[in-house]
Structure formats: structure tokens, C-alpha cells
Amino acid sequence: ILMLTLVTENRTPLLGILKGDQIEKTPIGQKAAEEIQKIPTYDGAKSIEIYSYIVMPDHIHILLRIHEKLPIHIGNYIRWFKKQCTDNCRALGVPTTRLFALEYHDRILKGKHQLEHMAKYINDNPRRLALKRQNKELFTLQQDILLNNIPCTTMGNMFLAEYPIKQVIQCSRRLTQEQIDELKAQCLAQAQEGTIHITAAISEGEKQIARALREAEYPIIVLLQEGFPKPDSPHYRYYKPAGVYFEACAKGKLLLVEPHAEVLERSEIITRTEAKIGKIPHDTQRYRFVAMNVVAEMMAGGERES
């Protein structure tokens, strides 16, 4: 199974218009949909089956099921598809050098679970686009935000950072499942009383507790390390969190925070990190993980109790 993503040149929305939570295809988008159906005929052997696809205003997703070894490289199918779409675009009176950008993204899916998950994801694209447009302030990357004097890039509900009662989720990797479950119950009880939790979600225990809070729809602040595209990246403008983080963000229940790279080298953070684990190289995973939890403590306004 192969998932293909193609975007229009300069992300120009020529393929469709969002109406409610559905995409109304333009004539160009309708022609692109028709060309998608023709992809299995390109090699004459019908080695490819179209499992699912979606046409969005400025991009398309296609799920291909490949039944046997292709007689030609998949790139040849894509080039042929893009050429046909560009020809159709010109025939409709829209002058363009090319409809789709030169690059494309492909991803191999393994197993029925990945296939079903990705099919659900691409079919849900219009609804998620509607949510993003309805909640622009929640899906805008904000640069150089200071949280407790820590410079960050953020996305989500900034009001969560201003709430006075915040608690860090921090779990040692040595905790047993029983201990994790006990801490999870404590965090859920705190959240019910109004506490906002902060976590880097690094250890298994931290991930489990963050998941439980999210599933219960309690607000949460999640620290990321190199989680956002850079401002000069072509993906910066179009970034949105994936999966469950997207849903939480749309509901105003999530704040994603990426401390600037130099933050982990601040003297105060180095001192507090080394007090926990001793002096180790700063480029190690261990140092970065513990330092991120120190940053979470500082954003919460102190150190985690217990």
C-alpha cells in the first residue's frame, strides 16, 4: 500500500472550495479526480488499484494498492498523472506551467491497521480543514513567546499558560505500571479540580498520563523538542498537529510549546539538570530529556511535588 500526496504549484487552491465541512471540486479538481481513476490503466497491466483518495483545494491524497511488481517506477505514473492534469487545466482555459509542484511525498503503509487509519485520515481532511479555518487563532504558530521568561514557539490555547495552578507530569522510567496508574489517577483528580498539567511526554508513564488526560478532554500543555517546522520551511504556513492533538487543539484543550534551542544551554537549566543526573554531555538523549522536564518545572513556576 502506498500513500501519495501531491500539492499544487505554490499551494494555489485550484482544485476545490471548502463548503461547510465538504470540498466542492472546481472543474480542474473534477478533472484531477477523473485522472486519479485512470492511474491503474497507465501501464496496461492494471498492477495498481485506487483504494481511496481525496481532492482538497490545494493538494490531493491517494491511497494505492499495488498488487504486483510494477513494470515501471511509480514516479513514471505520477509524472504521467501530473502531465494529464496540467493539460486538462490548460484545456479549461487556466494558463499554467504546471498544476502540481515537482515534488511529491510517498509513504509505504504496512498492515491493515495502517491502511484503515490512513483512509480514515484522508477522508476526514475536509472536516479538519473546516475546524482549522474556524479556529485560526488556535492553529497559528506564534514565534518568540515568553513563558516564565523562556522563549518559545507555540500553537494552541495560550490562555492555558496563564492559568495559575499548573502541575508537571514527570515519571521515572523505573516506575512500575501500578505506580504509573496511581500517578495517573492523581493527575486526573487534579485535572477535575482545575489543575493544568504540563508534560514533555517522554517516558512511557508520562505518555500514558498525557493520553488519559487528553482522552478525558482535560486541558494540557505539551512540550516539544524540534516539533515545529522552521519559519523558512515551506511547511511552516501549513503546519497543523496530527491526529488526536489536532482534535484537542480545535477544542482549545491543548497548548503545544517548543522552547528555543538555546534554552537547554541556559546556566540555570544546566545547574538544575546536573543536580538531578550529574554532569553528562549535553548532546546526549538523557541530558535533553531531563532538561526538558526542568523546563516544564520552570514553566509551571517551580518543581514538581513528590
Language model region names:
Residues 1-142, 146-150:
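Short catalytic/metal-binding and nucleic-acid-binding patches
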Residues 141-306:
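Glycine-biased, small-residue-rich flexible motifs in mid-sequence functional cores and linkers
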